[in-house]
């Protein structure tokens, strides 16, 4: 203890300074060159082997500083303590966290004080301490020591022990302030029972990271704890859902296995504990040799069919490096405010895997959610063929690790997406065997065959519902084909129903929708498919059934035809989408109404009539001032109601124009709304003229 205080309080300013250099390099992103060179001279004169080794490791890592390495330093915190991505063998006496006492449950604390339950080291093999609920960690430790050893996990340097565990996307360093666990006067300890002190140090590091220095553990699962110890891929499946060939496939890869019983029941004939994990020592034929971590030397042998009956969960860990030569990892931040706006994979973090070879290639991908105080949050990983709007597969769980094994055909691609129900940092670990298999973050903007349109609804007047819903004009261009199959995905971010319409852009009255699902869409996501002509403009209208809606929506348009290019532009049904517009409310007390107006130059005209107050029958026409020939007109008398009537769109060459309205019958207490859109500025001239009074 005295030696440790010397390290922390007086002596090792050089170690503290090295820690500050790490912090400046990776967190603050600025290292003073003069300060660093001065520090190197100090280390040379100190003649400390461990310090020199730690400095060399720092210099090497600085030369290879990448986005990944910086991200791993920026995400080194868990439970308020720091765990840098350093190897235990290179860390020396670097102390990253202040001393803090572990917390014990009341029964554990009472047992410790009474000296009744702590155990000594008189055991031949690793055993779970009966007062600690860490069967999963002990099973993991049994399997890891037996399969790949723990020599590289722990390094002793004087009064400091350094332990490597895998979490938060990297192999990370846990500094223990004493190379021993807490003991009573008899040198008995409340820890894993083992003749190897390194096992106790590994367990202490595990409880610090996984449970925030709290020995009152409710357990985890062996697959996750095995990953934390050695970094092997974790997989958790229900025994009832897999067959023995499935198990054999992983055994052939050298996998470690463990089994978990039901939380509520066990089969009495097998004498197993409820809600407890067991290590699988080996499998001979179809017979599993199983060990209870609480009891050393007691091996249970069960055939596969009995295993399926007696156990609920099968835990698998396997080393992907044995199957693949190439490894990449990608760190990203999952922001639920951004990525959970809509029920669509197009809003999720996505990575594209491209196979540019003549043969199909296997790919193994693991998405690792970083540690947080929130447990049992759901995560989902999906696979997309090409750029389809519907995923091929989606798998999810709540353990924080989700992995997928896929095969990418020759000259093809697959897209991986990740979903979480909360904010988190995440890491994608990806293994493959070909340097020609390329992986990169993907965005829908990279595709010419996929258009993603974002918009929003805002509260509007009931008088404007038809014309003021958001709309987009789009066209699918292709040099060779006349028609394509089109898929659409429509998502919105409120609980109200919605509707989607598609029209030919030439259908200026919007009378013949090519797509209009009968009735409103009740769910905040809908898919459609239809055939459209290429090189032909269309208009799509996104409607909310609630005029007071204040919410975002997203529309995706996709075609599988190679060589297609989708172009889009926002438009509006109001005023024909033209730049200049005005509306005028006119009384229908007179039978004939003349509205003169002027335009600044020759222009397109889009004229809409509707009446919210009462149905009307009228005819309407536009003339050049002084001319008897109509530029555009209704085909005689037409009914006008709350569904707008659009006059044929026309081009007016003259600047002085007159809009003439003639009613079949006057309606004194009613009005008609006139909306005019044009390409240039215009204005009505003077007062309305009632021709019936002239």
From Swiss-Prot:
Domain named Calpain catalytic: residues: 80-320
Organism: Eremothecium gossypii (strain ATCC 10895 / CBS 109.51 / FGSC 9923 / NRRL Y-1056) (Yeast)
Protein's job: Required for the proteolytic cleavage of the transcription factor RIM101 in response to alkaline ambient pH.
The entry's keywords: Hydrolase, Protease, Thiol protease
GO molecular function, one term: cysteine-type endopeptidase activity
Protein name: Calpain-like protease palB/RIM13
EC id: 3.4.22.-
Domain of life where this protein originates: Eukaryota
Class of this enzyme: hydrolase
């Amino acid at each position: 203890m005295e030696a440790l205080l010397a390290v922390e309080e007086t002596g090792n300013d050089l170690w503290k300074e090295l820690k500050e250099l790490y912090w400046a390099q990776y967190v603050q992103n600025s290292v003073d060159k003069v300060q660093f060179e001065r520090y190197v001279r100090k280390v040379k004169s100190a003649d400390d082997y461990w310090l020199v080794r730690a400095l060399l490791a720092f210099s090497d890592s600085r030369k290879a500083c990448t986005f990944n390495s910086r991200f791993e330093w920026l995400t080194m915190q868990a439970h308020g303590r720091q765990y840098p991505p350093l190897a235990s063998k290179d860390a020396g006496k670097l102390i990253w966290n202040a001393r803090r006492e572990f917390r014990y449950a009341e029964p554990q604390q009472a047992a410790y004080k009474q000296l009744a339950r702590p155990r000594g080291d008189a055991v031949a093999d690793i055993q779970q301490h009966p007062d600690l609920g860490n069967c999963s960690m002990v099973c993991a430790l049994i399997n890891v020591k037996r399969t790949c050893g723990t020599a590289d996990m722990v390094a002793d340097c004087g009064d400091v022990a350094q332990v490597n565990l895998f979490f938060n996307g990297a192999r990370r360093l846990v500094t223990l302030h004493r190379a021993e666990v807490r003991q009573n006067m008899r040198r008995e300890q409340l820890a894993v029972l083992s003749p190897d002190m390194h096992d106790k140090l590994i367990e202490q590091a595990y409880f610090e990271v996984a449970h925030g220095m709290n020995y009152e553990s409710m357990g985890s699962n062996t697959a996750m704890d095995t990953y934390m110890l050695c970094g092997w891929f974790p997989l958790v499946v229900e025994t009832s859902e897999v067959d023995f060939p499935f198990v054999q496939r992983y055994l052939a890869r050298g996998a470690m296995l463990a089994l978990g019983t039901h939380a509520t029941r066990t089969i009495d004939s097998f004498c197993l504990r409820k809600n407890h994990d067991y290590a699988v020592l080996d499998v001979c034929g179809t017979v599993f040799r199983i060990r209870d971590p609480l009891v050393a030397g007691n091996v249970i042998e069960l055939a596969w069919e009995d295993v399926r009956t007696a156990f609920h969960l099968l835990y698998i860990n396997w080393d992907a490096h044995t199957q693949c030569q190439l490894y990449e990892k990608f760190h990203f931040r999952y922001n639920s405010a951004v990525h959970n706006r809509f029920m669509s994979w197009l809003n999720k973090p996505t990575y594209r895997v491209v196979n540019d070879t003549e043969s199909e290639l296997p790919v193994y991908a693991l998405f690792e959610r970083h540690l947080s105080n929130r447990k049992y949050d759901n995560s989902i990983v999906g696979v997309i063929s090409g750029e389809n709007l519907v995923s091929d597969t989606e798998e999810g769980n709540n353990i924080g690790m989700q992995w997928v094994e896929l095969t990418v055909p020759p000259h093809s691609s697959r897209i991986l997406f990740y979903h979480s129900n909360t904010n988190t940092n995440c890491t994608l670990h990806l293994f493959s065997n070909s340097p020609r298999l390329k992986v990169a973050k993907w965005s829908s903007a990279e595709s010419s065959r996929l258009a993603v349109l974002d918009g929003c609804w805002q509260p509007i007047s009931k008088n404007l519902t038809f014309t003021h819903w958001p709309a987009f004009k789009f066209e699918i261009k292709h040099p060779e084909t006349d028609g394509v199959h089109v898929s659409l995905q429509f998502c919105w971010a409120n609980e109200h129903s919605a509707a989607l319409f598609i029209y030919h852009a030439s259908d200026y009255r919007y009378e013949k929708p090519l797509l209009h699902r009968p009735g409103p869409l009740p769910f905040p996501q809908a898919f459609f498919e239809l055939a459209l002509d290429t090189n032909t403009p269309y208009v799509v209208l996104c409607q909310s059934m609630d005029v007071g809606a204040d919410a975002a929506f997203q529309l995706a348009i996709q075609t599988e035809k190679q060589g297609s290019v989708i172009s889009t532009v926002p438009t509006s049904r109001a005023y024909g989408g033209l730049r200049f517009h005005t509306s005028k409310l006119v009384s229908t007390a007179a039978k004939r109404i003349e509205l003169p107006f002027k335009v600044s130059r020759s222009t397109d005209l889009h004229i809409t009539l509707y009446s919210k107050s009462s149905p009307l029958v009228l005819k309407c026409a536009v003339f050049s001032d002084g001319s008897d020939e109509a530029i555009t007109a209704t085909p005689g008398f037409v009914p006008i109601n709350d569904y707008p009537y659009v006059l044929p769109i026309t081009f007016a060459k003259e600047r002085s124009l007159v809009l003439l309205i003639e009613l079949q019958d006057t309606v004194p207490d009613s009005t008609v709304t006139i909306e005019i859109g044009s390409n240039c500025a215009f204005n009505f001239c003077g007062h309305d003229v009632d021709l019936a009074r002239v």
